[in-house]
C-alpha cells in the first residue's frame, strides 16, 4: 500500500478523521470500502482514497454512510 507523502488536500474536513479513525482501529481501507458498499454507498477504492486524502468533496449522504460504517456519529466526523 502506498503511504501518504506531501501535503494533503483541503476539499473536506472529514477525510482526515476517517483516515485517522480507520488507522487507529486497524481497519484496512478495503475493509471500510466493503462495509460502505454493504451499507449501500456506491464508492470506489480510488474515490475513498481521495476522500481520505481530502482531495475530493464529500456529499452529505456520504458523511452518514461513513459514520455508520465506523460506528460513530455524524457529529464526531464534522466536529473539529
Predicted features and spans:
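Short alpha-helical DNA-recognition segment
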Residues: 26-50
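Residue-level signal for the short linker/turn that defines the boundary of a DNA-recognition helix
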Residues: 13-16, 27, 31, 43, ...
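DNA major-groove recognition helix of helix-turn-helix/homeodomain DNA-binding modules
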Residues: 55, 59-76
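Short, contiguous strand/loop micro-motifs
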Residues: 5-6, 49-51
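A short, Lys/Arg-rich alpha-helix, primarily the initiator
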Residues: 1-25
Amino acid at each position: 500500500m502506498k503511504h501518504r507523502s506531501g501535503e494533503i488536500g483541503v476539499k473536506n474536513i472529514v477525510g482526515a478523521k476517517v483516515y485517522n479513525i480507520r488507522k487507529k482501529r486497524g481497519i484496512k481501507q478495503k475493509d471500510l470500502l466493503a462495509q460502505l458498499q454493504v451499507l449501500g454507498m456506491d464508492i470506489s477504492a480510488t474515490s475513498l482514497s481521495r476522500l481520505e486524502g481530502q482531495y475530493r468533496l464529500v456529499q452529505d449522504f456520504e458523511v452518514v454512510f461513513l459514520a455508520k460504517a465506523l460506528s460513530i456519529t455524524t457529529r464526531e466526523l464534522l466536529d473539529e
